[in-house]
Amino acid sequence: MFRSTRTTDQWRVGERLQCPAGHARAALARTADGGAVGPFKCVFVGEMAAQVGAVRVVRAVAAQEEPDKEGKEKPHVGVSPRGVKRQRRASSGGSQEKRGRPSQDPPLAPPHRRRRSRQHPGPLPPTNAAPTVPGPVEPLLLPPPPPPSLAPAGPTVAAPLPAPGTSALFTFSPLTVSAAGPKHKGHKERHKHHHHRGSDGDPGACVPGDLKHKDKQENGERSGGVPLIKAPKRETADENGKTQRADDFVLKKIKKKKKKKHREDMRGRRLKMYNKEVQTVCAGLTRISKEILTQGQLNSTSGVNKESFRYLKDEQLCRLNLGMQEYRVPQGVQTPFTTHQEHSIRRNFLKTGTKFSNFIHEEHQSNGGALVLHAYMDELSFLSPMEMERFSEEFLALTFSENEKNAAYYALAIVHGAAAYLPDFLDYFAFNFPNTPVKMEILGKKDIETTTISNFHTQVNRTYCCGTYRAGPMRQISLVGAVDEEVGDYFPEFLDMLEESPFLKMTLPWGTLSSLQLQCRSQSDDGPIMWVRPGEQMIPTADMPKSPFKRRRSMNEIKNLQYLPRTSEPREVLFEDRTRAHADHVGQGFDWQSTAAVGVLKAVQFGEWSDQPRITKDVICFHAEDFTDVVQRLQLDLHEPPVSQCVQWVDEAKLNQMRREGIRYARIQLCDNDIYFIPRNVIHQFKTVSAVCSLAWHIRLKQYHPVVETAQNTESNSNMDCGLEVDSQCVRIKTESEERCTEMQLLTTASPSFPPPSELHLQDLKTQPLPVFKVESRLDSDQQHSLQAHPSTPV
């Protein structure tokens, strides 16, 4: 019969599929010797004649494959549909991959095999390179093989035939693993779809698929026991998409380590001797000229001894009270725990040309555009008492200095920490003067209760927590004696403590800068006064105190009790602790005149002390030159008390609007132990941030009230010009005010042309409103008063 190469290949495949290894070799030998029959006859093997399944398989393989209408091969008779699908996918995928196109049918690999992982995936599905069952995949992927030979292509292990008693077809036992040979270079190529195929030139490169079941280690060696040749390391892609080899990455890492060590060796290690908490002036970090430190006194062995010696030299220089050139504030050392704003303020020194210029700091606020003057007591602690007085004079002269329009240059001046030597105001009066009557408001109500300062101190102590207390504020009390409806008393010991400060000694109502000449401090009508505020806070309705005064309910309230929805019922109440914009002034009516103000702040502590001073007030001050514009924009009623001069609160939106209109302002936060000075014509508003006890008073500066000196100069000039002696007459100038009515007499010499009283105050009337004058003779006057009896009369 006729025999072709294709028939021989199919016979080999059939024998290899169903027979064991030994029987497959024998069948191949018989086929080579001519023992095979034609394509339309059955081949019966002697050893396998009893197995019907084997006969069916051999008959199906020996049958001539006829293509269908579409040009595809018909499925084999004895092959299951699953095997046919695998053969079709393998054939179509291989042909497409040969043409450079990926196969349309996806491989049968499980989804986890598409992602490269280092775990053992288990048995792999058949691929193009190494099929699990050696079948017709190899002839489809490779060109026609050479003439058949007896030597097999490679050591292959075929599944044994099923037992004679079994009737099922293709029931294979688990595959056995054979020893793998050496892996040649270029054995497998990486495809973009993670498929592997054998090389075209080497028929032995097609390794059976059971080699793929071996575990792989990280170093590329197989765990089968036989070491393989390591494949070249793949290039890894970095973040930028560039590929770099692993050895290059290791080299770069080593170079970086070497550079880092080299830099550490070059820099050297420097020990930190001081912590942040001790980096102060007293820690030995001050700068002293090198001429003072002699080389013989220094210990070159220890750096700590050097710093200790420097500290001792600083202390000696401080005791000697040397000049500011020899002992100055260090430039590089600042006090600890300073905020960024405070640090920037301390860096800006005001160049006054004096030796105290390093202690005066000027702040130009970028938002508001106004100027603020600052001084810090921790820097002034180096000064002697005499130098402190000289510095106070210079600082206050700058504070109240004015331009040609009689407007102050600075909106506010602050001496931070200047009141630290004073005791807590509330504790002082509660323990030393417990029966002093005070007027106390009820929190959130308009009722006023009169109690003692000791009882008020107890309520504050009971409700104080974290900077605020939930008791009513204490209204102002006078410290220089109560007049009419005022509350307070005269406390000379406390006033003496205030005068210990050089800043307060000059700016008290009877101070050296004041125009008043009082015989006793109790005659002052400008203060000081003291009051206590709890701080702005939100208070739940359950914590709101009830009013002690019962009032009759109206019919409207009784009707509202029928239905109160929870949405409309307030659950908490905002307690506003604010003083709206106002201008400090003295006098009423035509005697109204703006004046300066001084204040001292003491936070209510009750045992909660901290290194950093607590913020107590949030202040907004407008520039004195914009006084008229601010009065018009805010609609101020200057003749009202300070509490009711303005009806609206100036917030950030209003400030921004006024700033766009050219009005300058300064926003400052005042802290515990601060002393502040406000020049005249400066409109300001206060908001209490935390519980604070405040002192305040007005000061009538000599530069604001030059009336008495002008009157005396005019009197001397008139006495020199007048040559006639006539009976002396008394001119009584009566000034009427709302609070009091005082009379003042000026003794002058009568002349035929007596000058009117308005000429005596010609210079003062240019900037102040005219008071009401009454001229009477001395004979008709029933009462006589001297100028020294009432020196505090505003004129």
UniProtKB/Swiss-Prot annotation:
Phosphorylated by PKA. Its cofactor is Fe(2+). A motif (Nuclear localization signal) lies at residues 252-263. The modification Phosphoserine is found at S80. It comes from the Eukaryota. InterPro entries: RSBN1/Dpy-21 (IPR026306). This is Lysine-specific demethylase 9. Its EC number is 1.14.11.-. Residues 182-197 have a biased composition (Basic residues). Testis. Expressed exclusively in haploid round spermatids. Residues 122-150 have a biased composition (Pro residues). Residues 210-221, 232-248 have a biased composition (Basic and acidic residues). Belongs to the round spermatid basic protein 1 family. Its main location: nucleus. 2-oxoglutarate binds at T579, Y676. GO terms for cellular component: nucleus. Keywords: Chromatin regulator, Dioxygenase, Iron, Isopeptide bond, Metal-binding, Nucleus, Oxidoreductase, Phosphoprotein, Transcription, Transcription regulation, Ubl conjugation. Fe cation binds at H582, D584, H684. Binds 1 Fe(2+) ion per subunit. Residues 784-795 have a biased composition (Polar residues). There is a cross-link at K290, K313, K734, K774 (Glycyl lysine isopeptide (Lys-Gly) (interchain with G-Cter in SUMO2)). GO terms for molecular function: histone H4K20 demethylase activity; metal ion binding. Residues 64-158, 178-248, 774-795 are annotated as: Disordered. Histone demethylase that specifically demethylates dimethylated 'Lys-20' of histone H4 (H4K20me2), thereby modulating chromosome architecture. It is found in: Nucleus.
